């Protein structure tokens, strides 16, 4: 049974929705922290920082690393470190290092979630234009989509550097709807985090929240999307298509 009426396009978030990018992001964050002689965070912690773009990711990483370093030194009976470099400058340096390292590990550290390719293919075959809206820095987006063999499904791709205001601001979603030539209420937006759902609500788009993403450790139902699914292929019956049961490995 269709849950959505008059949907003429579908747009997706990337990290935590279509792809598990945490391994690559965490590796790059830790390499950048290590280069500045700061404690490394690990994937489990970095996952809670993903979703607001690279600059915010660096701010969260630096804040945690400075606090962690202070705690470690206090435990060892050592005096605190006086940072000669202001935090804002350290964030800028950390971001530069992160970009370099992430460029090296992004493809090998990013995997499609199950059923993503089948679902995108089924929606495209139905004739629905598909869009991508991500806060990820734009230079990383196209190469990653190509490496994962899903670039072919999207008619509109908006990266984090393509708009002045990133999600949760509605501008990226409004831009995608405009380029699709449809009204915002005719574009379904699918994401895994409160930023995604807030952006969809602000833009006037119906929303789907997926339970398996990152979302800062919060349950997606707290953001009150219109519908919550555990798997991305649950979209298909909601849009009048048969449910795909094809299995995909992370490396497909």
Curated annotation (Swiss-Prot):
Any one Gene Ontology molecular-function term assigned to this protein's record: phosphoglycolate phosphatase activity
Catalytic residues (positions): 13 (nucleophile)
Record's catalysed reaction(s): 2-phosphoglycolate + H2O = glycolate + phosphate
Pfam families: Hydrolase
Listed pathway(s): Organic acid metabolism; glycolate biosynthesis; glycolate from 2-phosphoglycolate: step 1/1
Keywords: Carbohydrate metabolism, Chloride, Hydrolase, Magnesium, Metal-binding
EC number per UniProt: 3.1.3.18
Highest taxon listed in the record's lineage: Bacteria
Cofactor annotation: Mg(2+); chloride
GO cellular component: cytosol
CDD domains: HAD_PGPase
Amino acids binding Mg(2+): 13, 15, 192
HAMAP family in the record: GPH_hydrolase_bact
Subunit structure: Monomer.
Family according to the record: Belongs to the HAD-like hydrolase superfamily. CbbY/CbbZ/Gph/YieH family.
Protein name, per record: Phosphoglycolate phosphatase
Organism for this UniProt entry: Shigella sonnei (strain Ss046)
């Amino acid at each position: 049974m269709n849950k959505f009426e008059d949907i003429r396009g579908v747009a997706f978030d990337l990290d935590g929705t279509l792809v598990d990018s945490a391994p690559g992001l965490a590796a790059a964050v830790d390499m950048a922290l290590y280069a500045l002689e700061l404690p490394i965070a690990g994937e489990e912690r970095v996952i809670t920082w993903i979703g607001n773009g690279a600059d915010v990711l660096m701010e969260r990483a630096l804040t945690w690393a400075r606090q962690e370093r202070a705690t470690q030194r206090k435990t060892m009976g050592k005096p605190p470190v006086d940072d000669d470099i202001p935090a804002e400058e350290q964030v800028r340096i950390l971001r530069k290092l992160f970009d370099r390292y992430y460029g090296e590990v992004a493809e090998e550290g990013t995997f499609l979630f199950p059923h993503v390719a089948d679902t995108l293919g089924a929606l495209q075959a139905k004739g629905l234009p598909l869009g991508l809206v991500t806060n990820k820095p734009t230079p990383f987006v196209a190469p990653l989509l190509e490496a994962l063999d899903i670039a072919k499904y999207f008619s509109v791709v908006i990266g984090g550097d393509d708009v002045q205001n990133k999600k949760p601001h509605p501008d990226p979603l409004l831009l995608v709807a405009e380029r699709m030539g449809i009204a915002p209420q005719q574009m379904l937006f699918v994401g895994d985090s409160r930023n995604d759902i807030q952006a969809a609500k602000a833009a006037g788009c119906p929303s789907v929240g997926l339970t398996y993403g990152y979302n800062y450790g919060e349950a997606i139902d707290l953001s009150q999307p219109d519908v919550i699914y555990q798997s991305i292929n649950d979209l298909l019956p909601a849009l009048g298509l048969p449910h795909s049961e094809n299995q995909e490995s992370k490396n497909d």
